[in-house]
């Protein structure tokens, strides 16, 4: 589910990711992928929270990443202003030359994140 994160006057598309779901990517002609993630803060959460994401390469775990984040004061989700995005956190993965499918999943039950994928050549 794409969501528009508003930062000042700029709108950036992120994809909502809930526990139990995976977002898949099939990069072509790239050397590196950067996954940007922002935790969705809702009312009962404190100002600082932790979360974990796991990156898969085909059916093999590529890596598990643990993040600590805090609420962002200058960004909102256009489609749901009650949800406050956290400050962005990222992980980079190096890609092999052959074709692979990469996916990312959230490991924390009861939480959701917004994910964006950037490719580098």
Show where each model-derived region lies.
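A short beta-strand element within beta-rich, extracytoplasmic domains
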Residues: 29-42, 104-105
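Beta-strand-rich ligand-recognition modules
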Residues: 57-119
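Conserved long hydrophobic alpha-helices within structured protein cores
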Residues: 25-35, 59-65
């Amino acid at each position: 589910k794409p969501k528009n994160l508003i930062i000042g006057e700029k709108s950036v598309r992120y994809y909502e990711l809930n526990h139990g779901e995976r977002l898949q990517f099939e990069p072509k002609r790239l050397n590196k992928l950067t996954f940007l993630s922002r935790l969705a803060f809702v009312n009962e959460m404190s100002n600082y929270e932790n979360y974990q994401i796991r990156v898969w390469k085909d059916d093999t775990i590529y890596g598990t990443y643990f993040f600590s984040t805090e609420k962002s004061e200058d960004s909102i989700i256009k489609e749901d202003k009650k949800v406050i995005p956290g400050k962005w956190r990222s992980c980079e993965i190096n890609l092999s030359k052959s074709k692979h499918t990469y996916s990312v999943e959230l490991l924390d039950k009861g939480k959701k994140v917004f994910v964006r994928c950037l490719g580098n050549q």
